[in-house]
């Protein structure tokens, strides 16, 4: 059995005991998070969400992804600008899926 949940502006397909990476959430390691925005669970589609369904996850880690380097070049001026970016993420483990 799997479910489709919404976190931020993205959707994730999850199963029990899955570990997923989502956009950074303001939670501490070890906390439990309940997602109420469930689009699909156990062959039931929501309109837009399944009533009473929820997915419970545990926060395993807060971190940042690998660095992405971006170079901006301005032509005819021999000028370069170098930028770096590391996207923060939260690693979650699916603990329970409730049908509702």
Swiss-Prot record:
GO terms for biological process: translation. Keywords: Ribonucleoprotein, Ribosomal protein, RNA-binding, rRNA-binding. GO terms for cellular component: cytoplasm; ribonucleoprotein complex; ribosome. One of its GO terms (molecular function) is structural constituent of ribosome. SUPFAM superfamilies: L21p-like. The keyword RNA-binding applies. Pfam families: Ribosomal_L21p. InterPro entries: bL21-like, bL21-like_sf, Ribosomal_bL21, Ribosomal_bL21_CS. The keyword Membrane does not apply. NCBIfam families: L21 (TIGR00061). Belongs to the bacterial ribosomal protein bL21 family. This protein binds to 23S rRNA in the presence of protein L20. Part of the 50S ribosomal subunit. Contacts protein L20. This is Large ribosomal subunit protein bL21. It comes from Mycoplasmoides gallisepticum (strain R(low / passage 15 / clone 2)). The lineage of its organism: Bacteria, Bacillati, Mycoplasmatota, Mycoplasmoidales, Mycoplasmoidaceae. The gene is rplU.
